[in-house]
């Protein structure tokens, strides 16, 4: 049996954690995933981002929604300066902020279900200034900073969801279309029994060619991807007390 290959990166002990980074190293980073949600917003410079096989070219103000368990990596050329903010978010904390029909975790769910991960901060949206205000509160600290940061975080997530609901998405700039289609199919059928032969027949491709292209594009095998995704889904389902059948 092939060992699990995806790397779990980062950790989160707080309800949310914000980073403000700027560099031009262009370090190559393999596909990886987190057990928490993540938002990346590009503030300046040039950068690309890949999520579940889709590659995007980012412009300043664009933000990337990376839900828990989604494989992703930055795509940055050596010497290309880019400044960004990265927000780690605990899924349970985000769901607990739900009021009525306003669930702030909806944006991540929609991104994963529609396979649309990048959105543009335009049309009067204040996502970028809200990120900056939250960063300033965290940086300054002082009396009431934690409470103020919670309020600013909530406001930011409401605005992010408004942008997503408004459909201000950024189209993918690249990726192997066959592999992307396969990734999307796998994510929609994680609870179904799947075999390599059945997948190859569905996508009209030899199984050996399919497995080779999948590994070339993602760095991982179809089996390794499925196994890890199913384990992540099982943890999520068990954590929510569901009795959904898992394979």
Model-found features: residue ranges?
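Structural motif
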Residues: 46-48, 55, 71, 93
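Short beta-strand/loop turn elements enriched in aromatics
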Residues: 7, 23-34
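Short, conserved beta-strand element in jelly-roll/cupin
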Residues: 32-49, 65
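All-alpha amphipathic helical-bundle segments outside canonical DNA-binding/catalytic cores
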Residues: 122-125, 138-155, 173-176
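Short acidic-glycine-tyrosine-enriched beta hairpin
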Residues: 53-68
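Regular secondary-structure segments
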Residues: 43, 128-142, 183, 187-190, ...
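Terminal helix-turn-helix DNA-binding modules in bacterial transcription factors
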Residues: 184, 188, 193-198, 205, ...
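A hydrophobic/aromatic-rich effector-binding and dimerization subdomain
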Residues: 1-22, 68-139, 157-166
